[in-house]
Regions:
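Long, charged/polar, soluble alpha-helical segments
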Residues: 1-93
């Protein structure tokens, strides 16, 4: 559990420091992947022994949102055909 928490945090933090938007997306997806793996193998109660699970998920998701918005701003074609319903909910349009 601690290893997955550390890796999720490490990759997500890296994404916030990346200068290249698409590399930031890559690193944020790595971070989210570790979070999802963590959630697959551990309950919130188990995760809570090390970190607040809701806050942790919020921060990992926030890093991914920031990276994605940076990538779309730098490369508008990156967004492709967007689902306007989901984009509105995400605050992107």
């Amino acid at each position: 559990i601690q290893t997955l928490i550390r890796q999720a945090a490490r990759w997500s933090a890296a994404s916030l420091q990346d200068k290249t938007p698409l590399i930031a997306v890559l690193h944020s997806v790595y971070g989210a992947g570790y979070l999802w793996a963590l959630k697959d193998i551990a309950t919130d109660d188990q995760i809570a022994q090390f970190v607040d699970p809701k806050k942790f998920e919020t921060e990992i998701t926030k890093a991914m949102d920031i990276a994605t918005k940076r990538a779309v701003a730098a490369c508008p074609g990156y967004a492709g055909d967007v689902n306007s319903f989901l984009s509105q909910l995400a605050g992107e349009i």
